[in-house]
């Protein structure tokens, strides 16, 4: 096979092979190799099985460099991938409320112009949250003009003891390998999914938030007759957002979280998914190590600010 072998499994390759009427090239990750055939996984998650007798040339090629991300676009995509129960706008600023469940679902997302002086926009923001009995909070991208504007207006850290939240990204071909477990991807979460996702009762606003995106799915792995790992995926354009990953304490360090990511990546490929993002607290060293090993890199960091 022109130099490819089992040692190249997991590496990026190009394979030229015969098809009816001519030759074609397949570029992707070498997923399996045998003396009589090989399989290549394309970036869109499709798998190409090629007979050895049809291969005319094949070689490893360098990893595709991770292109710089459009941070502003990703900042907005994260909000669309997990929409709040209630939303309102002040210019381009997005106000979100979800009965207090999660910071993302109950905070201002200041992106772009509010269409009025910042001080006036912040008064609208405080009124919005006061009317709902919620503390006024803003999710701000560190280093952004909006973050500086809010701090200059007297807004301070809402969670000073918590580390920064990292939004991390990579291309789909880094994470769409075949998972080592059977990953079920469903359009609707089951009671067993929710039981695995939460300790104790499910917060009342959670289903509306988690199921509110127009193109969201719910992944799970079942072992020993019980759901032991779950996660959620949502598509916004070519972006796959992954969140709500949770693994039962008795089943950790077995690659189940990685399997959930891979299962969701393989679901999104045929739907046009090309890039993926997720979030992790900087202090969550185990998650950071896993995601970095999978090829995720930091896009930006955020914190929550409050006026009180």
Identify the residue ranges that each predicted region occupies.
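Conserved beta-strand-loop-alpha-helix junction that forms the acyl-donor binding cleft
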Residues: 139-146, 249, 278-288, 305-308
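Conserved GNAT acetyl-CoA-binding A-motif
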Residues: 132-141, 268-279
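Conserved acetyl-CoA binding element of GNAT-fold acetyltransferases
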Residues: 104-113, 238-249
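Flexible, substrate/cofactor-facing loop regions flanked by secondary structure
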Residues: 177-244
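Conserved acetyl-CoA-binding loop-helix of GNAT-fold acetyltransferases
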Residues: 118-126, 244-249, 253-270, 289-293
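SH3/SH3-like beta-barrel fold
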Residues: 15, 37-45, 50
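N-terminal charged segments
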Residues: 1-10, 20-26, 31-33, 46-131, ...
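Acyl-donor-binding surface of acyltransferase catalytic domains
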Residues: 81-84, 94, 101, 118-195, ...
């Amino acid at each position: 096979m022109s130099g490819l072998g089992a040692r190249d499994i997991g590496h990026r390759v190009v394979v030229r092979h015969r098809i009816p009427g001519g030759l074609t090239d397949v570029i992707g990750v070498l997923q399996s190799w045998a003396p009589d055939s090989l399989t290549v996984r394309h970036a869109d998650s499709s798998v190409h099985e090629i007979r050895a007798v049809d291969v005319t040339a094949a070689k490893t090629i360098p990893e595709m460099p991770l292109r710089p991300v459009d941070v502003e676009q990703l900042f907005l995509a994260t909000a669309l991938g997990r929409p709040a129960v209630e939303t309102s706008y002040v210019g381009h600023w997005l106000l979100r409320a979800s009965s207090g469940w999660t910071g993302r679902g109950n905070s201002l997302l200041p992106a772009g112009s509010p269409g009025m002086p910042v001080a006036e926009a912040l008064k609208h923001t405080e009124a919005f949250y006061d009317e709902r009995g919620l503390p006024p909070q803003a999710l701000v991208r560190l280093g952004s003009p909006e973050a500086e504007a809010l701090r200059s207006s007297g807004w301070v850290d809402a969670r000073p003891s918590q580390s920064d939240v990292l939004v991390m990204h990579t291309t789909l071909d880094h994470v769409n390998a075949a998972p080592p477990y059977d990953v079920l991807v469903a359009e609707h979460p089951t009671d067993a999914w929710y039981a695995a996702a939460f300790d104790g009762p499910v917060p009342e606003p959670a289903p509306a938030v988690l199921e509110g995106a127009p193109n969201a799915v719910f992944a799970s792995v079942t072992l020993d007759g019980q759901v032991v790992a779950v996660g959620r995926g949502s598509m916004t354009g070519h972006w796959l957002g992954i969140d709500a990953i949770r693994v039962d304490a008795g089943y950790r360090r077995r690659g189940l979280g990685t399997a959930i990511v891979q299962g969701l990546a393989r679901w999104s490929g045929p739907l046009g998914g090309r890039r993926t993002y997720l979030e992790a607290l900087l202090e969550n060293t185990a998650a950071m190590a896993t995601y970095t090993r999978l090829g995720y890199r930091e896009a930006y960091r955020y914190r929550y600010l409050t006026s009180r």
